[in-house]
């Protein structure tokens, strides 16, 4: 039964492939995201830029706020829990959330263990900086992987770094002889079966999205170019001058990332982008949480 549920959740996540998932804090924002063509929304009380600016401990959002967003849209709704916080995940499952993101954006509840996601019916999303992290989260039951990037910055450099690292490691593993996969699994600290899957198929066994710092249609197209199968956009939309227009442009750019002429048109007159933070100005590196 567990295997069947795991396969079902992975298939559900595959249905989001090629789409854009947007952070929203109100039902109105959720409707803007849905109208723009988002394949799902991430419900949270504060977008990552505000979480970073406010500091302090950040926790799961109020279930009443999440329910308001669930009622406002017909597309899937995701919500975040702290790394390792089993009770928060149970609460989200109880309110019938569509996906749970065990997220480094929130303050970690456990600095050693992640949630055993196989104990839940709802599919989980997890972040990763490299292939080892991704496969460890998948072994725990994650149905979807995203780059960690550096959320709330508007700077895409870490998402690029994480996606390039992951795709390079996948290529390297796929190129090994069969009898070298055991040693590779040991070095990655992952089960042999998962390493063998990547070796045989040249990809992760789950869908792999980009997240962290995506703020423009060009950013979204870049991440697709580098191997992402979809994009999360957080602060980049509702911290910009024209959220509705920018949201629609990013959705179209993600779906048509090879069309440079269209990308040029989509990038025109979008209003001011979020101000952002350069990588070397960041005080708290969220991507380092939960390896």
Swiss-Prot record:
<dbReference type="InterPro" id="IPR013785">
    <property type="entry name" value="Aldolase_TIM"/>
</dbReference>
<feature type="binding site">
    <location>
        <position position="213"/>
    </location>
    <ligand>
        <name>D-ribose 5-phosphate</name>
    </ligand>
</feature>
<feature type="binding site">
    <location>
        <position position="164"/>
    </location>
    <ligand>
        <name>D-glyceraldehyde 3-phosphate</name>
    </ligand>
</feature>
<feature type="active site" description="Schiff-base intermediate with D-ribose 5-phosphate">
    <location>
        <position position="80"/>
    </location>
</feature>
<dbReference type="GO" id="GO:0008615">
    <property type="term" value="P:pyridoxine biosynthetic process"/>
</dbReference>
<feature type="binding site">
    <location>
        <position position="23"/>
    </location>
    <ligand>
        <name>D-ribose 5-phosphate</name>
    </ligand>
</feature>
<dbReference type="InterPro" id="IPR033755">
    <property type="entry name" value="PdxS/SNZ_N"/>
</dbReference>
<comment type="similarity">
    <text>Belongs to the PdxS/SNZ family.</text>
</comment>
<feature type="binding site">
    <location>
        <position position="152"/>
    </location>
    <ligand>
        <name>D-ribose 5-phosphate</name>
    </ligand>
</feature>
<dbReference type="Pfam" id="PF01680">
    <property type="entry name" value="SOR_SNZ"/>
</dbReference>
<dbReference type="InterPro" id="IPR011060">
    <property type="entry name" value="RibuloseP-bd_barrel"/>
</dbReference>
<dbReference type="GO" id="GO:0036381">
    <property type="term" value="F:pyridoxal 5'-phosphate synthase (glutamine hydrolysing) activity"/>
</dbReference>
<keyword id="KW-0456">Lyase</keyword>
<dbReference type="InterPro" id="IPR001852">
    <property type="entry name" value="PdxS/SNZ"/>
</dbReference>
<dbReference type="GO" id="GO:0042823">
    <property type="term" value="P:pyridoxal phosphate biosynthetic process"/>
</dbReference>
<comment type="subunit">
    <text>In the presence of PdxT, forms a dodecamer of heterodimers.</text>
</comment>
<keyword id="KW-0663">Pyridoxal phosphate</keyword>
<protein>
    <recommendedName>
        <fullName>Pyridoxal 5'-phosphate synthase subunit PdxS</fullName>
        <ecNumber>4.3.3.6</ecNumber>
    </recommendedName>
</protein>
<keyword id="KW-0704">Schiff base</keyword>
<comment type="pathway">
    <text>Cofactor biosynthesis; pyridoxal 5'-phosphate biosynthesis.</text>
</comment>
<feature type="binding site">
    <location>
        <begin position="234"/>
        <end position="235"/>
    </location>
    <ligand>
        <name>D-ribose 5-phosphate</name>
    </ligand>
</feature>
<dbReference type="GO" id="GO:0006520">
    <property type="term" value="P:amino acid metabolic process"/>
</dbReference>
<comment type="function">
    <text>Catalyzes the formation of pyridoxal 5'-phosphate from ribose 5-phosphate (RBP), glyceraldehyde 3-phosphate (G3P) and ammonia. The ammonia is provided by the PdxT subunit. Can also use ribulose 5-phosphate and dihydroxyacetone phosphate as substrates, resulting from enzyme-catalyzed isomerization of RBP and G3P, respectively.</text>
</comment>
């Amino acid at each position: 039964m567990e295997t069947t549920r795991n396969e079902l959740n992975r298939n559900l996540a595959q249905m989001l492939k090629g789409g854009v998932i947007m952070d929203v804090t109100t039902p109105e924002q959720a409707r803007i995201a849905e109208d723009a063509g988002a394949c799902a929304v991430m419900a949270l009380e504060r977008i990552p830029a505000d979480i970073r600016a406010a500091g302090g401990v950040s926790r799961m959002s109020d279930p009443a706020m999440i329910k308001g967003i669930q009622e406002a849209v017909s597309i899937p709704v995701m919500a975040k829990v702290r790394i390792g916080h089993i009770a928060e995940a149970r609460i989200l499952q109880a309110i019938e959330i569509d996906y749970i993101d065990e997220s480094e954006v929130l303050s970690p509840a456990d600095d050693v263990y992640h949630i055993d996601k196989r104990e839940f019916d709802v599919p989980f999303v997890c972040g990763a900086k490299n292939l080892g992290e991704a496969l460890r989260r998948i072994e725990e039951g994650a149905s979807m992987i995203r780059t960690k990037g550096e959320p709330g910055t508007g700077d895409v450099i870490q998402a690029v770094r994480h996606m390039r690292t992951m795709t390079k490691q996948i290529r390297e593993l796929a190129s090994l002889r069969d009898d070298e996969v055991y040693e590779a699994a040991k070095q990655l600290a992952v089960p042999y079966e998962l390493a063998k899957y990547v070796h045989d198929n040249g990809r992760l066994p789950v869908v792999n999205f980009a997240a962290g710092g995506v703020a423009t249609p060009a950013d979204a197209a870049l991440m697709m170019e580098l191997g992402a199968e979809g994009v999360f956009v957080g602060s980049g939309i509702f911290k910009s001058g024209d959220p509705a227009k920018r949201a629609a442009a990013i959705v179209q750019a993600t779906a048509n990332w090879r069309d440079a002429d269209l990308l040029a048109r989509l990038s025109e007159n979008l209003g001011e982008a979020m101000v952002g933070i350069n990588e070397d100005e960041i005080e708290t590196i969220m991507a380092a949480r939960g390896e």
